[in-house]
Amino acid sequence: MGIDFLFILKALIIAIVEGLTEFVPVSSTGHMILVGDLIHFNTQSGGFPEMYEVVIQLGAILAVVVLYWRKISSSVVEFLSYIFSFIGLKASGDKRKYEKRLAESKTGFRFGINVIIGTIPAAILGLLFHDEIKEYLFSTKTVAIGFIVGGILLIVIENNFRKRAKRSKIVKDIDKMTYGQSLLVGCFQCLSLWPGMSRSASTIMGGWISGLSTTVATEFTFFLAIPAMVGASGLDLFKFDYSQMNATNLISLILGFIVAFIVSLVVIDKFINYLKKKPMRIFAIYRVFAGIVLAILIFTKVIS
C-alpha cells in the first residue's frame, strides 16, 4: 500500500490546529473534533485519529517543557532535595545542615506539591470515567455546547475577577500559591474533560476565583498540563491497537508531533505577552460565536 499524501496533509492541518488552540482558552479537543469532521480526518478506522491527537498533544506539551525548562528543572531538584533533606534531618544528628537545605529547597517542594494537588481531581475523574467520557462527550453537539457555556463563564468570571482585583490582593507570584488555591484550580480542571470547555479556560477560571492573577493562573495551567496530558495520553496510547499501523500513519505521527511542537512554542510566548496587556474577552466572544455557528451547521446537517 502506497503513502497517502492527502491523509498526511489532513494530519498536518490537525497538528496546526492543536498547536494554535492547546494553550489558549478555546478548547483544542473541540477544535480538533470539529476540523477533523470537516476535512474527513476522523473517518479512518482502527482508532488512529484518536491516537494521532494524543501524540500531537505530547508535541504541544514538549513546548511547555522547553520554554519553562529552567523552572521545571530547578523545581524538580528542589523537590527531591527537600524530601531527602527531611529524611536526613530525621535520621542524622546534624540538624543545622539539613535545616538549611530544607529552607533552601522549600519553594520548589511547595511548587511541586501544588502541581500534584492540582492534578489529582481530574486524574481521578478521568480514570474512573475514561470510557464514558470518550463515548458520550466526544461529539460535535457536546463541543458546540461546551464552546458556548465556556465562553459565557469566561466573560462572567473574568468580569467578577477584575472587580475583585481592584479591592483585594491577588497572587502575582506562582511560588506564593497556597495548597487550597491549587486544589480549587484542579477541581476546575475537571471541566476540561468535557470537550469544548477547554482545559486552559477551566483552570484559568479556577485561578481567578481562587485569587490568582491572570498570568499566574495561565502559567500554572501550563505546568498542570504536563502531568495531566502525559497521563491521559499514556492511557490512550496503551489501549491503541498498533497492529494496524502503516507507513502513512507513521509519517503523520512524526510530522504532526514536530508541527504541533513548533506552533505551540510560538503560541505560548505570544499568549503570555497578550495576557499581560489585554483581557480574555476576545476568546470568550469567539467561543460563543463558534458555538452558535457550529450549532447551526449541526441543525442544518452540514456536519453531523
Curated annotation (Swiss-Prot):
InterPro entries: UppP. It is an enzyme of class 3 (hydrolase). GO terms for molecular function: undecaprenyl-diphosphatase activity. Keywords: Antibiotic resistance, Cell membrane, Cell shape, Cell wall biogenesis/degradation, Hydrolase, Membrane, Peptidoglycan synthesis, Transmembrane, Transmembrane helix. GO terms for biological process: cell wall organization; peptidoglycan biosynthetic process; regulation of cell shape; response to antibiotic. It is found in: Cell membrane. It is a multi-pass membrane protein. It comes from the Bacteria. Belongs to the UppP family. Bacitracin is thought to be involved in the inhibition of peptidoglycan synthesis by sequestering undecaprenyl diphosphate, thereby reducing the pool of lipid carrier available. This is Undecaprenyl-diphosphatase.
